[in-house]
Amino acid sequence: DESLSANGEGPTLFSVMDHCATAMGSREMRRWLREPLRSTEDTSARHDAVEAIMGDEPSREHFFAVLDALPDVERIASRVSLGTVRPRELASLRDTLPTLSALGASLADSPLDLIAGIGRSMTLNAEIWERLEQSLVSEPPGMLRDGDTIASSCSPELAELRHFRDDTSRILLEMEERERAATGINTLRVQYNKVSGFYIEVTKGAADQVPMHYQRRQTLKNCERFITPELKSIEDRALSSKERSAALEKELYDKLVAETAKHTPELLAAAKAAAQLDVLCAFARHAAENRWHRPKLSSRPGLDIRKGRHPVVETAIENYVPNDCRLEDGRRMLIVTGPNMGGKSTYMRSVALIVLLTWAGSFVPAAAAEIGPIDRMHTRIGASDDLAHGRSTFMVEMTEVADILRHAT
């Protein structure tokens, strides 16, 4: 994937091929290009899938639309298994897994085994996202410490703690109304300050009307302040509700993550399948847009490329001159000669890249191509001296050529 890359700059085979909608797909494409197949059956299955997707543009664009909405399920699933996943990442799974699973179900009956297998892997147990739907608020914060991640409906205790945390003033007013009605003291007030905490205040004249369970907390010039067991309980819970709700929320969140982690293998399999579908769609789109054709796989050693083009160079120039290349039992070597900048290296690279693309499962930039079995590819293009080890440029070149000849089959 470093084709025509100048010190990491400029277009590469990967950069021109990467039409993937997801980060997972881009990583998978890089793996396919770096690790081409050797099995004719597996490679043909990829070609069949690319051909089918290429011929159905509406479905291809629908696939891209679904994939484009996906988060990085692979990375999120890994963080779930490690217990380091963030609330918004879990929410992104909750929001997108139903659509992904529905797409998988629609593909599971495909007549193509590769597509059907991808569909089955993408079809997930609804229990995964249903549990997330029940447990998470609609828009959780970025970090758990920010609070309000778990839905109050999940835990009566959490709901009560948040009730005390957020509605202390209303709780005091409700108690004030109840106590006024119970005692008949219309001037009774239930209040709070940082010095005295929570208290019931009555005027001096009404102090003798308070019930027996009122405990005197403070005597002032014009009023008396009392506390009751109920108010003391409210005080304790209100003052500690923030810390306790945060601790309980973390406990519930950790439990949710642990339950989700049980489905990590399914999530990773679905992510892998989605990435494969993404690559196949990207291959199909690139082939459709650039007039690439399906290569034919042969059991005979050799290759026959008609009007082959360099997949990177053709994107940079308008009038690319295609070339043929044929190698077989009676024609196992070509010696290519020509002036500097005459296209020798580009020609050799185009042949190598067409072979690589073939066994990666892609269509190729050629009018036709028949490619035999390939077990390895060696290149030696460009060299410089190695004075530190006493090797001239010529010596470096000959050493590299010798290494190629030793390992060639």
Predicted regions: what they are:
Residues R376-T409:
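Switch/coupling sub-region of P-loop NTPases
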Residues D1-G342, T346-H378, E400:
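Alpha-helical coupling/stalk and coiled-coil linker elements that connect catalytic or binding modules
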